[in-house]
Amino acid sequence: MYRTAASRARALKGVLTRSLRPARYASSSAVAETSSSTPAYLSWLSGGSRAALTSLDMPLQGVSLPPPLADKVEPSKLQITTLPNGLKIASETTPNPAASIGLYVDCGSIYEAPYFHGATHLLERMAFKSTLNRTHFRLVREIEAIGGNTSASASREQMSYTIDALKTYVPEMVEVLIDSVRNPAFLDWEVNEELRKMKVEIAELAKNPMGFLLEAIHSAGYSGPLASPLYAPESALDRLNGELLEEFMTENFTAARMVLAASGVEHEELLKVAEPLTSDLPNVPPQLAPKSQYVGGDFRQHTGGEATHFAVAFEVPGWNNEKEAVTATVLQMLMGGGGSFSAGGPGKGMHSWLYRRVLNEYQEVQSCTAFTSIFNDTGLFGIYGCSSPQFAAKAIELAAKELKDVAGGKVNQAHLDRAKAATKSAVLMNLESRMIAAEDIGRQILTYGERKPVDQFLKSVDQLTLKDIADFTSKVISKPLTMGSFGDVLAVPSYDTISSKFR
């Protein structure tokens, strides 16, 4: 008996070996012959007779094959339609099975009058809550039913509401998205719940020194709307309510200031679904964005502790000056930086200017990184750092020295080529995400009225020279300094002393 079982096992092993050996472009007749000669070993082991076993090269009965991939996929083309009321609908098709759709509004904290401070922050948190047509529970269940994912974000100049799901659910996605933006109910208990969460969020901001300083230098560096807080001031939480949000939306959420953008959706399908839902939005001429003036300034908050956090920044042109905004982006990538401890493993970012010349040389510096905050007409470029209080003055001096060295032409071609390659790869990798692609469409149309081809951006990066980087940096650091410090700031030099380091 055992001998018989072993014999069958050895025979089965031979069958499996022959069955799993790949056929080299077998013809249909050869496949048929192979199928008829292959033993049905499962039946054989159970005592049945040898029968034909269907080849793995043949499709199973009742199972349809997916459509074959095209040999060549044409680049997606963007289509834009402007409705009579001024709202723009834009989309590009992709071979992805999923789609991302967003409603982008030319509205942010710069449009907040003092009475409305914190409105955009609260609107962001009230996104996809109860509407006049749906309870929050029903809305969540409908999004879950289509496997959707929603998000909202608010910035100083723009707001976005997005939804992501399989493209077979485009009608449902568009309807839920537009209902959530156009018809919020602003129920008192939902508003009060989000206000309580905002209070916690504001308290947590003080525990994030870099985020806190980046917010503070806008208030110190600008005069006008850009100095308004992006996060709601704690003093405004008692004043914010549903009626105030409705008033703010009525003033700012008009058709001419909205773009419905999608990635992975046929334009005609999107237009067919969205036009009836948005054509009755009021046709109001777009409001001119309020202007801000860069003035420079100093912000300090002493909280004690064992570290000093600082940020030094200067004004740079905004996205409407495309060449110089691109130069600022490449300069940020060239300067790079990071923390003394890299959570992503050793070697990450270590070829950047600040990493090689500051973090690797001075153990007292815990963090040193370049940053940008660019808007339509203006922006900030600077360096954030963190060190021990005793080393704070030296760390700030090092930040000034490195910017002066770049302005003095000490960057070589290898440094610039690495920064340009990193900039281009970051943009191209981000655009592989359909959600980022939809966001790019919406925000560019709000800014430029069109979407500029990515090749144009890449060409602008390629055209930058060492002289461009040096001249740009020299011009930037000649402007008034904006300075911020947080933590143990007792040893931080005066504003005039720091400003003189850049001259």
UniProtKB/Swiss-Prot annotation:
Top-level taxon: Eukaryota
Keywords assigned: Membrane, Mitochondrion, Mitochondrion inner membrane, Transit peptide
Biological process, per Gene Ontology: proteolysis
Transit peptide region: 1-59
The UniProt record lists the keyword Metal-binding: no
Gene Ontology CC annotations of this record: mitochondrial inner membrane; mitochondrial matrix; mitochondrion; nucleus; plant-type vacuole
Keyword Mitochondrion attributed: yes
Residues of the signal peptide: none
Main location group: mitochondrion
Topology class, membrane: Peripheral membrane protein
Entry's family note: Belongs to the peptidase M16 family.
PANTHER family: METALLOPROTEASE, MITOCHONDRIAL-PROCESSING PEPTIDASE SUBUNIT ALPHA-1, MITOCHONDRIAL-RELATED
Assembly and binders: Heterodimer of alpha and beta subunits, forming the mitochondrial processing protease (MPP) in which subunit alpha is involved in substrate recognition and binding and subunit beta is the catalytic subunit. Component of the ubiquinol-cytochrome c oxidoreductase (cytochrome b-c1 complex, complex III, CIII), a multisubunit enzyme composed of 10 subunits.
Functional summary from the UniProt entry: Substrate recognition and binding subunit of the essential mitochondrial processing protease (MPP), which cleaves the mitochondrial sequence off newly imported precursors proteins. Component of the ubiquinol-cytochrome c oxidoreductase, a multisubunit transmembrane complex that is part of the mitochondrial electron transport chain which drives oxidative phosphorylation.
Record's protein name: Probable mitochondrial-processing peptidase subunit alpha-1, mitochondrial
